[in-house]
């Protein structure tokens, strides 16, 4: 099975190892992975800020970049969720509506692809540590991915998995929301940080890197010793003793 990696901006620039882990996981389950170098931003920041025409330029480039891909898989529910919005955005456009539908139909977040497409719920991973999971808003509400990440985490040998209280509450990031509404955002992430502390987890795991930056930043400012990691880092671990 051939899969094209949608790296996403934050993974490309900030969380470079997430791309590596994603590729290694896909290869472990028998996928042949390529990287279309012409890909760019999915257009979400511009779109959410009201710059529709500017956003469409990025979206058209993405459609062209992945035109020949069999499957498109990315390590972000938010960014993949944006690809799923393309058919709505290009609805009625004689040149771009069908290509937008084609891209949306073959695009998946990594855990969604593993569980729902490949039927993989156990990667044979080993990880020792107390872990809690934050389900991001876009992952759950836009993309509809709720069970797949936890199924995979709970299959990891040696893991001590604990549910996050009121787990589906927003962390306050929301892309440009945290910039436009900083006071509200700060209170939301403060509450999320408290919920993480209540679990006594050593690791906070998530599938969207914007959320991880936001929550991790808050916990560091509070002096909390909780490691914040992307789910692919846990799933691609084959040793006991956690992450250094």
From Swiss-Prot:
One of its GO terms (biological process) is lactate metabolic process. One of its GO terms (cellular component) is cytosol. It comes from the Bacteria. GO terms for molecular function: oxidoreductase activity. Belongs to the LutA/YkgE family. Is involved in L-lactate degradation and allows cells to grow with lactate as the sole carbon source. PANTHER family: LACTATE UTILIZATION PROTEIN A, UNCHARACTERIZED PROTEIN YKGE. This is Lactate utilization protein A. The gene is lutA.
């Amino acid at each position: 099975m051939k899969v094209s990696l949608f790296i996403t901006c934050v993974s490309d620039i900030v969380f470079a190892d997430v791309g590596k882990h994603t590729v290694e996981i896909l290869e472990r389950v028998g996928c042949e992975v390529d990287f279309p170098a012409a890909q760019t931003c999915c257009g979400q920041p511009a779109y959410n800020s009201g710059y529709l025409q500017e956003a469409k330029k990025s979206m058209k480039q993405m459609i062209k970049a992945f035109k020949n891909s069999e499957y498109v898989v990315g390590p972000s529910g938010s960014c993949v969720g944006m690809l799923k919005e393309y058919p709505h955005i290009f609805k009625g456009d004689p040149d771009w509506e069908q290509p937008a539908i084609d891209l949306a139909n073959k695009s998946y977040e990594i855990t969604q692809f593993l569980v729902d497409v490949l039927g993989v719920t156990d990667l044979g991973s080993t990880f020792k540590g107390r872990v809690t999971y934050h389900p991001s808003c876009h992952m759950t509400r836009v993309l509809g991915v709720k069970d797949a990440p936890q199924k995979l985490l709970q299959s990891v040998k040696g893991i001590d998995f604990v549910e996050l209280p009121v787990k589906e509450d927003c962390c306050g990031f929301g892309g440009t929301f945290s910039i436009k509404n900083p006071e509200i955002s700060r209170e939301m992430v403060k509450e999320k940080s408290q919920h993480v502390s209540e679990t006594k987890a050593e690791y906070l795991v998530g599938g969207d890197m914007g959320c991880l930056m936001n929550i991790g930043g808050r916990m560091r400012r509070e002096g909390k010793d909780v490691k914040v990691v992307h789910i692919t880092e846990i799933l691609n671990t084959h040793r006991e003793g956690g992450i250094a």
